[in-house]
Structure formats: structure tokens, C-alpha cells
Curated annotation (Swiss-Prot):
<dbReference type="InterPro" id="IPR018369">
    <property type="entry name" value="Chaprnonin_Cpn10_CS"/>
</dbReference>
<dbReference type="GO" id="GO:0046872">
    <property type="term" value="F:metal ion binding"/>
</dbReference>
<dbReference type="GO" id="GO:0005737">
    <property type="term" value="C:cytoplasm"/>
</dbReference>
<keyword id="KW-0963">Cytoplasm</keyword>
<dbReference type="InterPro" id="IPR011032">
    <property type="entry name" value="GroES-like_sf"/>
</dbReference>
<comment type="function">
    <text>Together with the chaperonin GroEL, plays an essential role in assisting protein folding. The GroEL-GroES system forms a nano-cage that allows encapsulation of the non-native substrate proteins and provides a physical environment optimized to promote and accelerate protein folding. GroES binds to the apical surface of the GroEL ring, thereby capping the opening of the GroEL channel.</text>
</comment>
<dbReference type="InterPro" id="IPR020818">
    <property type="entry name" value="Chaperonin_GroES"/>
</dbReference>
<comment type="similarity">
    <text>Belongs to the GroES chaperonin family.</text>
</comment>
<dbReference type="GO" id="GO:0044183">
    <property type="term" value="F:protein folding chaperone"/>
</dbReference>
<comment type="subunit">
    <text>Heptamer of 7 subunits arranged in a ring. Interacts with the chaperonin GroEL.</text>
</comment>
<protein>
    <recommendedName>
        <fullName>Co-chaperonin GroES</fullName>
    </recommendedName>
</protein>
<dbReference type="GO" id="GO:0051087">
    <property type="term" value="F:protein-folding chaperone binding"/>
</dbReference>
<dbReference type="GO" id="GO:0051082">
    <property type="term" value="F:unfolded protein binding"/>
</dbReference>
<dbReference type="GO" id="GO:0051085">
    <property type="term" value="P:chaperone cofactor-dependent protein refolding"/>
</dbReference>
<dbReference type="GO" id="GO:0005524">
    <property type="term" value="F:ATP binding"/>
</dbReference>
<dbReference type="Pfam" id="PF00166">
    <property type="entry name" value="Cpn10"/>
</dbReference>
<dbReference type="InterPro" id="IPR037124">
    <property type="entry name" value="Chaperonin_GroES_sf"/>
</dbReference>
């Protein structure tokens, strides 16, 4: 399991469905601009200029929304995960 450093977050991005309910295949231009992901692991947080630790706003298990193409994909055992900075997370799904 990966342990992210600083303000980085490890996410498991949900697979996008390639077909609609009617069975039509979506063209590349019609894909969503955002993705839903589950937080797998969270770093300790960011440090301010004075050295104070700012705790992360997300926790393992949270479902979040990120933009497509953000972060770095990494292979962790048999899973592919994405590492992003906390600032790249747009929202937490309630």
C-alpha cells in the first residue's frame, strides 16, 4: 500500500462507462470532464511557511470529484491508483 507524502492523496478512480443505458457507444468528445474517485490514503498534510501542519480535508473512504487528466497513475500491486495533490480535488460527495 502506498503512503502519500505531504498534501498528496491516493485515489482509486471509478471506471467510466463507455455505453449509455440505450447501448450507444459514447464518442470521445462527449465524455465527462470530471471523474469520481474513492480516497485510498492521505498524506499528513501541507506545511505553512511558519512550519505549521495543515491537516487534510479528506479522509480514506471519502468519495471525491476530480478533473479528468489530473494526477499521476501508479501501479500498486495489482491495482492502478492515481496520486493527486489535495488542491486538485474539486469536491467531496456527501
Amino acid at each position: 500500500m502506498l503512503k502519500p507524502l505531504g498534501d498528496r492523496v491516493v485515489l482509486k478512480v471509478e471506471e467510466e462507462k463507455e455505453q449509455t443505458v440505450g447501448g450507444f457507444v459514447l464518442a470521445g468528445a462527449s465524455k465527462e470532464r470530471t471523474q469520481v474517485a474513492t480516497v485510498v490514503a492521505v498524506g499528513d498534510g501541507a506545511r505553512t511557511l511558519t512550519g505549521e501542519l495543515v491537516a487534510p480535508s479528506v479522509a480514506a473512504g471519502d468519495k471525491v470529484i476530480i478533473e479528468n487528466g489530473v494526477g499521476i497513475e501508479v501501479k500498486d500491486d495489482d491495482n492502478t491508483v492515481t496520486i493527486v495533490r489535495e488542491a486538485d480535488i474539486l469536491a467531496i460527495l456527501a
